[in-house]
């Protein structure tokens, strides 16, 4: 074969080069345009996503401000000042119920009494608890009446708004006669709120009566059977004193309350960013506070990282530094195959297998020392965190192994030449040299799990509440809801353009910005790592 024949280009390649020359482009120019075009498209897509989220969520804060304005003008805020008292009293009765349960356990386990005898021994405490619980009844009845009045005012306002919208639509369609026939009953808040505000003297009298009842009930409290329970009961008495001492502040709020006071734009923003309630489709008042959703996402992600980081980084170190070639060929595909499992399949696995298995494991007596064990909620932070860890391991493993591969071979050889063992070389040379890359792998793993939807929707428990951190490490056995889960759960039920619809888009925007921040920090660490290695 001649040299010219051996180096001859394939016909198709030659034709392509000819076409490029006709376009005035070289092959290098075409490659640059192709890959540069892909990067440009990525930027465009990112910009479009950002614009879309801002456009759909932009009107939320204005709508939320109007939502808070109605809450004030209709008197709901006024009633909630009083309702806080009844809610705090309910919390105190729950404390009493816990005290009774502890005393019952003492009589059954320590005194070896029968259930009937134990209940008989608690008769005086039950009478005390009953009198404490019924002391709030007059105030609770008053709150019920005020709730009906405020709800009626709010309903009138909403109906008037619906009528205005109906008239606007008819006018836009050119049906002026029909639009003029739509009757709108405007709400005069000054007149509507007069009966509500007139109840202030009655409230003061009910408050004084409640204060006297609570003090009288405390004076007749039976002594607890053990010193430990006596300490807890003294704490209950202190809480009641604090509760009663707060009555004048409630009265002051009612006296100075003004329905005409404007709601600043900043309050609509802070109510979302720092709000502790996410309550929709409520007959009373809808609240859009992202804190419980953000905390839920953060808790599940932290549990996932606590589990995934040791496994992912440990596996990367073993495969890269210790494993034989045969072990590498077996381990790497197995770990990377995990990322191919659909998240919904993992969610079903969590519901049917993992959640139940962890709950049964928590009920083993030899594990009673573990915080939160035993527990009854099989769908919780721990279950979702374990499954998310499984999703994060391939990401952390792959990126951490790449970081270990980029450590110059001379580092290892110099360490061995100085007499260091393999373990010493790994711990003191290889891992520190690749630490920046490992940290970036962990951050990208965090970005992977914090944006996961199906697993947390199916396995986190979907309770919209801030976990009780007073439980310590046992907090991971509590159910939560997450930002991704709330979007997936509620988006199909909302009215396009409504406040609930826009609130979900603002949650999505927050999640999007959070993921961008995590990835930006991770990429910055990678760049610094590459510079230091270079």
Residue map of PLM features:
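Cytoplasmic-entry segments and transmembrane alpha-helices of multi-pass inner-membrane transporters
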Residues: 28, 32, 311-350, 399, ...
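Membrane-topology segments of multi-pass transport proteins
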Residues: 1-34, 54-286
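Membrane-interfacial helix termini and adjacent extracytoplasmic/periplasmic loops
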Residues: 21-29, 241, 264-288, 347-390, ...
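Short cytosolic juxtamembrane segments of multi-pass membrane proteins
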Residues: 523-534
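Transmembrane alpha-helix signature in integral membrane proteins
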Residues: 41, 290-316
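Transmembrane alpha-helices
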Residues: 337, 399-401, 407, 422-460
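Interhelical loop and adjacent transmembrane-helix boundary motif
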Residues: 458-512
């Amino acid at each position: 074969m001649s040299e010219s024949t051996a180096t001859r280009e394939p016909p198709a390649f030659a034709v392509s080069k000819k076409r490029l020359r006709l376009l005035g482009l070289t092959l290098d120019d075409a490659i640059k345009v192709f890959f540069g075009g892909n990067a440009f498209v990525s930027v465009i897509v990112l910009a479009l996503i950002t614009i879309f989220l801002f456009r759909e969520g932009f009107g939320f804060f204005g709508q939320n401000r109007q939502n808070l304005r109605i809450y004030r003008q209709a008197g709901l805020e006024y009633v909630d000042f009083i309702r806080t008292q009844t809610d705090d009293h309910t919390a105190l009765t729950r404390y009493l119920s816990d005290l009774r349960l502890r005393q019952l356990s003492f009589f059954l386990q320590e005194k070896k009494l029968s259930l009937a005898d134990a209940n008989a021994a608690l008769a005086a405490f039950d009478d005390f608890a009953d009198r404490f619980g019924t002391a709030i009844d007059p105030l609770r009845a008053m709150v019920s009446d005020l709730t009906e009045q405020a709800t009626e005012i709010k309903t009138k306002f909403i109906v008037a708004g619906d009528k205005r919208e109906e008239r606007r639509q008819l006018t836009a369609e050119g049906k002026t006669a029909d639009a003029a026939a739509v009757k709108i009953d405007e709400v005069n808040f000054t007149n509507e709120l007069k009966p509500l505000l007139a109840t202030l003297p009655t409230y003061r009298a009910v408050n004084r009566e409640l204060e006297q009842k609570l003090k009288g009930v405390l004076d007749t409290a039976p002594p607890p059977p053990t010193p430990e329970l006596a300490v807890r009961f003294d704490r209950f008495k202190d809480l009641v004193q604090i509760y009663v001492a707060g009555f004048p502040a409630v009265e002051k709020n009612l006296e100075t309350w003004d329905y005409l006071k404007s709601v600043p734009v900043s309050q609509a923003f802070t109510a979302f960013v720092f709000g502790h309630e996410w309550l929709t489709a409520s007959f009373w008042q809808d609240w859009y506070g992202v804190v419980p959703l953000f905390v839920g996402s953060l808790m599940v992600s932290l549990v996932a990282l606590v589990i995934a980081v040791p496994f992912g980084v440990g596996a990367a170190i073993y495969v890269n530094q210790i494993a034989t070639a045969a072990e590498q060929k077996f381990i790497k595909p197995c770990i990377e195959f995990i990322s191919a499992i659909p998240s919904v399949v993992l969610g079903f696995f969590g519901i049917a297998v993992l959640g139940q298995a962890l709950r049964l494991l928590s009920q083993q007596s030899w594990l009673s020392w573990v915080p939160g064990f035993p527990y009854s909620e099989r769908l919780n932070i721990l279950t979702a965190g374990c499954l998310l860890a499984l999703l994060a391991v391939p990401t952390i493993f792959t990126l951490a192994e790449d970081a270990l591969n980029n450590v110059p071979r001379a580092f290892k050889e110099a360490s061995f030449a100085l007499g260091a063992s393999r373990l010493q070389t790994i711990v003191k040379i290889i891992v520190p040299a690749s630490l920046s890359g490992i940290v970036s792998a962990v951050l990208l793993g965090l970005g992977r799990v914090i944006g996961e939807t199906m697993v947390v929707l199916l396995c986190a428990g979907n309770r919209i509440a801030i976990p009780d951190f007073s439980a310590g490490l046992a907090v991971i056995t509590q159910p939560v809801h997450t930002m991704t889960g709330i979007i997936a759960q509620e988006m199909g039920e909302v009215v396009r353009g409504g406040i609930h619809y826009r609130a979900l888009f603002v949650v999505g925007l927050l999640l999007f910005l959070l993921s961008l921040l995590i990835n930006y920090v991770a990429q910055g660490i990678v760049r610094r790592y590459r510079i230091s290695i270079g």
